[in-house]
Each structure stands twice: as structure tokens, then as C-alpha cells.
């Protein structure tokens, strides 16, 4: 594992727990399932010209705690989580420093990311667009429409990470709407698909480097 990562990841997890307890509000399971993914992006991958969208906005606290560990958010700002008149609520807001796009209602982050990726490609920019979605968002029609669009326009500057924790708010994913065989379905959309351990930093970074020309990149992160 990368140097310092264990300590920083632990700090992020501890702060998620602390703020959940203090505010009595958080989707803590959804937050914990993406910690290593957020760490890999913010600490090891994202460049200034790149864009990250957290489509599963209910994992807002994980993003806030990562931004704090990265020293983008102040302690005073993080301490305001869940309090009156704060911008740091249980669903992510673009009013928070370091956040690109407000999300919460599932299925909206990926369409935005696809549009952003198309715009960057038209402008011949070298920037990359990263979007983290939940497996529950695979129940949304907008997700599959966006994948069709991204594939048609050959958006190889787009990296879609699926937090495959296999559970939704009310039940396991397989009991709500079966999405398997997931990798085969996504590959059939002419996407570059890999499947990894979503808590393994080395696997996350390796998969983010596995880019193919003219194909959107999808990482199924088992968490």
C-alpha cells in the first residue's frame, strides 16, 4: 500500500464516525464503502484540470472528511456538518469548497459527468472526468441512457466507478432488481470494464490507469 495511506484512511474513517455521532445523521455504510476510492482519487490521481463528481450524494460525509484530510476543508467547516445554517448536509452540495456538483437524487451525477466529458473532448482538453456512482443507481434509466451516449461519443476521458456494495436503502440489490451479470452487460455497451476490490488502493490505482482509446472506462469496485 502507498506510504501514509493507512494513517490517512484511518483518519477519514474516524472522522466519519465522529461526525455521524455528533450530528446524529449520516449514511454511514455508504460512506465507509467508498473511503479507499475517494482517498485514491483525491490523494493519488486527481490533477487540477480533472473533475470528480460524487453521484451517490448520500455518501457526502465521506467526501467532506476526505476533503478535510486533504486540507481543502477547514476543521471549522467540517465541524459544522449537520448543524443549522451549514452547507455540509447529509447529501453533497456544490456550495461546499471542493465539490463540483450537488447530488442526492440518484441517477443525476452520471448524466452530468457524461456531458462534462463530451464538452472537454470537443474542446480537445486533456482533462479527465471521474464519477462515483452507487450500484443502486443501476436501477435508474438515466444511468443506462448515459452509458449509451458515452459509448456512442467514444468518451475515453470518462471514468465511471461503481460502488458495488450490493445493498440499497431497503434491501439487497439482488432482491430489488437483479443487475447481474454486470460486467458482461457493461462490456456489451462497448465500454472498457474492470472489476476490482474497492478497498485495495493498488487495485484502484491500477484500474484508473487502464484506459482504452475510444471507450468509456468503467470500474466495478466490490466493497
Regions found by a protein language model. Name each.
Residues 6, 10, 83-95, 116-118, ...:
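Thiamine diphosphate
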Residues 20-24, 45, 67, 190-193:
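Short amphipathic alpha-helical interaction patches enriched in hydrophobic/aromatic residues
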Residues 9-25, 163-165:
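N-terminal capping segment at the start of a domain
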Residues 26, 31-145, 151-152:
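Cofactor-binding active-site loop characterized by glycine-rich and histidine/acidic residues
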Residues 1-4:
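Non-catalytic, mobile gating and regulatory segments of ester bond hydrolases
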Residues 17, 21, 134, 166, ...:
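A broad detector of the eukaryotic-type serine/threonine protein kinase catalytic domain
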Residues 23-24, 103, 133-134, 162, ...:
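Short glycine-centered, acidic/aromatic-flanked micro-motifs in structured strand/loop junctions
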Residues 14, 18, 36-39, 184, ...:
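A broad, structural surface signal
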